[in-house]
Amino acid sequence: MYALADASNRITIENRGETFEGRPLLLLTITSPKNHSNIEQIQQEHLNATESNNTDTQNRPIVVYQGFSIHGNEPSGSNASLLAGYYLAAAEGPEINELLDNVVILFDPSYNPDGLQRFAYWANTKSNMNLNTYPNDR
């Protein structure tokens, strides 16, 4: 995810904290470069809309939250987040440009990094008929 953020002007990344085991809790903001430059104004417009009856969304981008893999033993979501993030960072053409001009995506690649690591460890040590206890083989 850091590489995507470094390579694309559509993505910013921030560490929102860390898990019990010390893994980072990342949040990517994915949108057009134009929206990134106005992100504080967009945030304020959305906050103001919660305090009024203004339901007009035609003049501001919508905000979407995408979170992947809350259950550690279901790794496909976090694995898919890499591909989804890459598509949003690198795709070209009018369709992706229109999407990112009209949407701010708050992108959480793994709700549960500790559980994902626990499952990966389990899968790598228990997936074979012959258990391998040698720690450097994991």
Language-model segments: which ranges?
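Divalent metal-coordination and catalytic microenvironments
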Residues: 22, 69, 107
